[in-house]
Amino acid sequence: MDERIISSETVDAEEVSFETSLRPQTLSQYIGQDKVKNNLTVFIEAATLRNEALDHVLLYGPPGLGKTTLAMVIASEMGSQIKTTSGPAIERPGDLATILTSLEPGDVLFIDEIHRLSRAIEEILYPAMEDYCLDIVIGTGPTARSVRLDLPPFTLIGATTRAGLLSAPLRDRFGVIDHLEFYTEEQLTEIVLRTSNILDTKIDDLGAREIARRSRGTPRIANRLLKRVRDFAQVRGNGTVTEKLAKEALTLLQVDPRGLDTIDQKLLHTIIQSFRGGPVGLDTIAASIGEERETIEDMQEPYLLQIGFLQRTPRGRIATETAYNHLGISYEKEV
């Protein structure tokens, strides 16, 4: 496949628009992440009672789990406007200064991929986050002088798939740090049913569960698979997504019962057949299957680790007995 249907990254502008149309507006509508939601409910209510901006929030976890959606829900619950940007989009200190000085009291600033901010940009954020002020330098050379501008109280929400790449000074300035976890099959089934209702697509409970089962614990993938299975239901079925039709469609889309596609299987086969199950270094795996190291770390490893198909050790990656069994390969434990 040219495009991984089970990729947890957004593919194009059309998919971004599709996701936006599905987003809940309140925490009560947001499915899953119950611990995170319960804590945020308390923090938001407390900030509202004190008439203060919510403390800065860092959301981290694999792609597609709802970090952007949750940021927008937080802003909605606070009755605030949200301005969105991303780490790579803020190239110069002036870019960030322009955004910060445009904020109104109580606004939410959402920075996706916040781990990709440069250190120079981070240093501007420190006083903005701590003291709601902005230090800028006017002029150059001997006549240069520093001017401090006051900023209105605001909430910064940062999202990242790689929290370990954030500098300690930046990470320490977030008052709320939440990790988003993979979703359960039951939660994803509920999401699929909700999305099908919004799309006016007929689906039965078993059909929804079959899609959920193969969605890698990720709502973005569940919604994408539903769209594709819906196509099969309309063209090759009677318009209703049943368990039988979902299985047939997902098999044709090369998504197996555990949500693995050909690239996942190639990775596991490489570890097992070329390196006797491991341990083998990530760079070696990447070179062997023709993928970038970062792609494997962000897109494939988290789920394979979650379902117990892969182990990460100081010496490298190891395919587990569960992975052998799933691929139908005989497992011989070394003595």
UniProtKB/Swiss-Prot annotation:
DNA binds at residues 293, 312, 317. Its EC number is 3.6.4.-. Residues 184-254 are annotated as: Small ATPAse domain (RuvB-S). The keyword Phosphoprotein does not apply. Residues 257-335 are annotated as: Head domain (RuvB-H). It catalyses: ATP + H2O = ADP + phosphate + H(+). GO terms for molecular function: ATP binding; ATP hydrolysis activity; four-way junction DNA binding; four-way junction helicase activity. GO terms for biological process: DNA recombination; DNA repair. It is found in: Cytoplasm. ATP binds at residues 22-23, 64, 67-69, 130-132, 173, 183, 220. The keyword Cytoplasm applies. Keywords: ATP-binding, Cytoplasm, DNA damage, DNA recombination, DNA repair, DNA-binding, Hydrolase, Nucleotide-binding. GO terms for cellular component: cytoplasm; Holliday junction resolvase complex. Mg(2+) binds at residue 68. Residues 1-183 are annotated as: Large ATPase domain (RuvB-L). Has 3 domains, the large (RuvB-L) and small ATPase (RuvB-S) domains and the C-terminal head (RuvB-H) domain. The head domain binds DNA, while the ATPase domains jointly bind ATP, ADP or are empty depending on the state of the subunit in the translocation cycle. During a single DNA translocation step the structure of each domain remains the same, but their relative positions change. Belongs to the RuvB family. NCBIfam families: PRK00080.1, ruvB. The RuvA-RuvB-RuvC complex processes Holliday junction (HJ) DNA during genetic recombination and DNA repair, while the RuvA-RuvB complex plays an important role in the rescue of blocked DNA replication forks via replication fork reversal (RFR). RuvA specifically binds to HJ cruciform DNA, conferring on it an open structure. The RuvB hexamer acts as an ATP-dependent pump, pulling dsDNA into and through the RuvAB complex. RuvB forms 2 homohexamers on either side of HJ DNA bound by 1 or 2 RuvA tetramers; 4 subunits per hexamer contact DNA at a time. Homohexamer. Forms an RuvA(8)-RuvB(12)-Holliday junction (HJ) complex. HJ DNA is sandwiched between 2 RuvA tetramers; dsDNA enters through RuvA and exits via RuvB. An RuvB hexamer assembles on each DNA strand where it exits the tetramer. Each RuvB hexamer is contacted by two RuvA subunits (via domain III) on 2 adjacent RuvB subunits; this complex drives branch migration. In the full resolvosome a probable DNA-RuvA(4)-RuvB(12)-RuvC(2) complex forms which resolves the HJ. HAMAP family: DNA_HJ_migration_RuvB. This is Holliday junction branch migration complex subunit RuvB. It comes from Listeria monocytogenes serotype 4a (strain HCC23). The gene is ruvB.
